[in-house]
Amino acid sequence: MMFGQIEEVYQALQRNGDVEFDWKDSSYTIEPGTDEDGKRYLAIWTAYCDKENYCVYKEESFLEQLIEKEVVDKVLNTKCFNGKSFLEIANDVELTSIMGQD
């Protein structure tokens, strides 16, 4: 990931956008969602084409329109990639899509 793109990632996620990326031969998506009970969240999902995807990590959001910076911080700092966080692996990540930034 290039310098400055982390700011684009934050901006997109705070605006209910999503980020798709590849890391170590696997694809992932970070995106907002809503549970069956109406609770909003920001989650990291696997993004496989040939098998069922699963939620790697999910953090609840309490705003109706946007995602709190604190929630984005928690998601990006959670050590769910072989003991490392998204921010720790950022230099080895290939961003494939960012939706929601300017």
Predicted stretch roles:
Residues M2-Q5, I67-V71, S85, I89:
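Generic short amphipathic/hydrophobic targeting helices enriched at N-termini
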Residues N16-V19, T78, T96:
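Surface-exposed polar/charged interaction patches
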Residues Y28-T29:
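Short, isolated positions in well-ordered beta-strands
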Residues G83-D102:
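Low-complexity intrinsically disordered segments
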